[in-house]
Amino acid sequence: MNVRRSAAAIAAAVTVIGFAAPAAVADPSPAPSASPSLPAGLYGTGDPQYDGVWRQSLALLAQHTVGVRPAAKAVDWLAGQQCADGSFAPFRAEPVKACDAKAMVDTNGTAAAVQALAALGGHDAVTGKAVSWLKSVQNKDGGWPYTPGGPSDANSTSVVIGALAAVGEKPESVVKGGKSPYDALVGFALPCSADGGGAFAYQPDKKGGLEANPDATAAAVVAALGQGLAAEGRSGKGSGGGGCADAGKPDPAQAAANGAAYLAQAVAKDGHLTSVLPGATDQPDYGNTADTVVALAAQGGAAQAQKPLKWLEQHAEAWADQGGPAAYAQLVFAAHAAGADPRDFGGIDLVDRLNATGPAPQATPVGKAAEDAKDTKESTKNDSSSGIWWAVGVFLVAGIGIGFLLISRRNKQPGQQP
């Protein structure tokens, strides 16, 4: 959620338009004060050129998830970023000017904005236009690319499925070329016999081969279950800890179970995923670990989600402080899905930290409302006990003389954009 992505997403976008924006770029500081060049309603203090809409969407959705009513100017800023055709670019410094052909619109930011605005309510016109645009750029395989005209990828397809579900659409009914989004999604799933069996690939390589990608897997598991960035955890034992089960081409439910099994195994030893970057020392992958918690909890593997959740509670504070609103949002989503208290996440209050990165909310649960919210979380945690696109490393990507920092979510890129 997180939103968010991998270098593969950037490479795919470069193929189509020369260069592309990551779903999320790390904020150097979570300080709330905006510089003269940043809109007052925007969350985060980092350059929003590549992730403004993504981080704003995740921040607002995370606030809504924990009962916080965001500042009106923050919501208005997000809605005001929409282009006339319904799409969203990562950031428009002058939204009064119409989007032109040079606007770097993308499916990930658009889908994330839909999820946030649909949850907040009162923006049917905006979300309706955005969904219409998303349908117009759907590929014939049923999936979506990061930028229109590119090949479908698991992360983009997943975040759009979440957007469709958020507005009450049935993703399986959104068909292009006789294919639904789920047809595309299961096409990225590796067979159990393969290395990394059960996982999802970001997209096929040039020879059609699939390589396991934890970022894509976490996103795809949630999407295959018909959920979005702020997925709900499922109580009960679930099937997140079982092995991969082949039955020919899996249906979405089986693909989700297989993907969750892969993720559960990936975090079983250390409690976290690892970011493997060319030329860099392997480091914990905080963002994709947060997304993994969401995926395991949504699939029903609450027991498997507890180890990575506890690891995040113990180790993710510095990462979130540096990552800013999108990172805090990913942790809120993880806590929400796994039944933890986001106001006591390893001793820190994620909600207060998130709120501090932008304009003061209109309302925050206090007193009995806050206690009720906490009791609900504890109940979910007890029920399930029986059973964030950011990589720590940064990439320097050159395209048309432009370099920018990537953070991986899943993934995804791929906030892509949680």
Language-model-detected regions and their locations in the chain:
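Preference for long, amphipathic alpha-helical scaffolds in soluble/luminal domains
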Residues: N2-P418
